[in-house]
């Protein structure tokens, strides 16, 4: 079941929380709405579900406009962060609930309900807990019950609001893998909300990064990591080093040092330079690729690599976080050398194109 979100706007009083949002979600795709608090991601999810109504715009399921349909008529499964299980019902009865309250003409008979719930219990690996009550379950088990209950009515679309937010780190990891496997098996269309970058990129087919009621980028997880569309995405998606300097001619000036860019940008003046920790070139010896001296402040072994916090020597005030591969891990106090050739340059929120990007733009003009 595909979802088309067309020009959705939403205001609460004078506060605009969604600004002309448009997004197409193909049938069978799992999409993460990712962003900080106040980005509008949960409001958008609730509008898809019919739990909130947009100020303007349309929601279509497989081409059918459902914008004015009540939530109960949209055939959407919704899983809340805090489970919303019925405390007085067993696990079995919680999962069966949605089936037992269907209109009489749609309601399965008791034997069919039992068979379906039994199958779902096996699917979520909780058959041995069918007679327990929510108070007797762990957080991860409760979330599986909530998911099984949502799937019981065979929803066209499954929506999840911060589904793992209330769980500890290890349980979250296990449930993420389990949900991804379940999605591969059942091929349902799903949208989930999260503020956790790792969760979004691990589980989703596509990540939609939101900020202040706008979509900043909607792409495959790897694309969002490697090719951020905006400065916000670059800074939000994981750790990043920022250096403030100036472009003069074909060089980036930082402190008393200059770094050749290999081309002369059209823009000249103050810039912010961004590098992910693994994008910083680092060496024990100075070279044309790694000419800038740093001193190791912290060294944290991470298995096949070492994460370092290094202090630039004479060319910048703020420490940098970098990654160094190999068995010969540096020690605190060691001198190393770094290079900046994989950097992204911004003037405010505007990206300064590299030479290859400038050539591509010129050829397409």
Curated annotation (Swiss-Prot):
ATP binds at residues 35-42. The keyword Acetylation does not apply. Residues 3-237 form the ABC transporter domain. It is an enzyme of class 7 (translocase). SUPFAM superfamilies: MOP-like, P-loop containing nucleoside triphosphate hydrolases. It comes from the Bacteria. It is a peripheral membrane protein. It holds the Pfam family ABC_tran. It is found in: Cell inner membrane. GO terms for cellular component: ATP-binding cassette (ABC) transporter complex. InterPro entries: AAA+_ATPase, ABC_SmlMolc_Importer, ABC_transporter-like_ATP-bd, ABC_transporter-like_CS, Mo/tungstate-bd_C_term_dom, P-loop_NTPase, Sulph_transpt1. SMART domains: AAA. Keywords: ATP-binding, Cell inner membrane, Cell membrane, Membrane, Nucleotide-binding, Sulfate transport, Translocase, Transport. CDD domains: ABC_CysA_sulfate_importer (cd03296). PROSITE patterns: ABC_TRANSPORTER_1, ABC_TRANSPORTER_2, CYSA. Signal peptide: none annotated. Its EC number is 7.3.2.3. It catalyses: sulfate(out) + ATP + H2O = sulfate(in) + ADP + phosphate + H(+); thiosulfate(out) + ATP + H2O = thiosulfate(in) + ADP + phosphate + H(+). GO terms for molecular function: ABC-type sulfate transporter activity; ABC-type thiosulfate transporter activity; ATP binding; ATP hydrolysis activity. The complex is composed of two ATP-binding proteins (CysA), two transmembrane proteins (CysT and CysW) and a solute-binding protein (CysP). Belongs to the ABC transporter superfamily. Sulfate/tungstate importer (TC 3.A.1.6) family. NCBIfam families: 3a0106s01 (TIGR00968), PRK10851.1 (NF008105). Part of the ABC transporter complex CysAWTP involved in sulfate/thiosulfate import. Responsible for energy coupling to the transport system. This is Sulfate/thiosulfate import ATP-binding protein CysA. The lineage of its organism: Bacteria, Pseudomonadati, Pseudomonadota, Gammaproteobacteria, Enterobacterales. The gene is cysA.
């Amino acid at each position: 079941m595909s979802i088309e979100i067309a020009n959705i706007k939403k205001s609460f009083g004078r506060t605009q929380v969604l600004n002309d949002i448009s997004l197409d979600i193909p049938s069978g795709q799992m999409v993460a709405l990712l962003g900080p608090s106040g980005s509008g991601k949960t409001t958008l999810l609730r509008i898809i579900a019919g739990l909130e109504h947009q100020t303007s715009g349309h929601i279509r399921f497989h081409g059918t406009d459902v914008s004015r349909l009540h939530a109960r008529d949209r055939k959407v499964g919704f899983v809340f962060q805090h489970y919303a299980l019925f405390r007085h019902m067993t696990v079995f009865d919680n999962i069966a609930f949605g089936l037992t309250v269907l209109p009489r003409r749609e309601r399965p008979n008791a034997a069919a309900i039992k068979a379906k719930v039994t199958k779902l219990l096996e699917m979520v690996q909780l058959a041995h807990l069918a007679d327990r009550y929510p108070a007797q379950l762990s957080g991860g088990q409760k979330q599986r019950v909530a998911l099984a209950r949502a799937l019981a009515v065979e929803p066209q679309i499954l929506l999840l609001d911060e589904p793992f937010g209330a769980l500890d780190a290890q349980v979250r990891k296990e449930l993420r893998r389990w949900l991804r496997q379940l999605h591969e098996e059942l091929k349902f269309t799903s949208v989930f909300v999260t503020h956790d970058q790792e969760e979004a990129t691990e589980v989703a087919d596509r990540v939609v990064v939101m900020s202040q009621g706008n979509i900043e980028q909607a792409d495959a997880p790897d694309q969002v990591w490697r090719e951020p569309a905006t400065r916000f995405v670059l800074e939000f998606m994981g750790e990043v080093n920022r250096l403030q300097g100036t472009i003069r001619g074909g060089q980036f000036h930082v402190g008393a040092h200059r770094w050749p860019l290999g081309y002369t940008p059209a823009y000249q003046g103050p810039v912010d330079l961004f590098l992910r920790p693994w994008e910083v070139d680092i060496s024990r010896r100075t070279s044309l690729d790694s000419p800038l001296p740093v001193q190791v402040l912290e060294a944290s072994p991470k298995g096949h690599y070492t994460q370092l916090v290094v202090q630039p020597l004479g060319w910048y005030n703020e420490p940098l976080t970098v990654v160094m591969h190999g068995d010969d891990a540096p020690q605190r106090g060691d001198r190393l050398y770094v290079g900046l050739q994989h950097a992204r340059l911004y003037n405010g929120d505007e990206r300064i194109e590299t030479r290859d990007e400038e050539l591509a733009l010129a050829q397409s003009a």
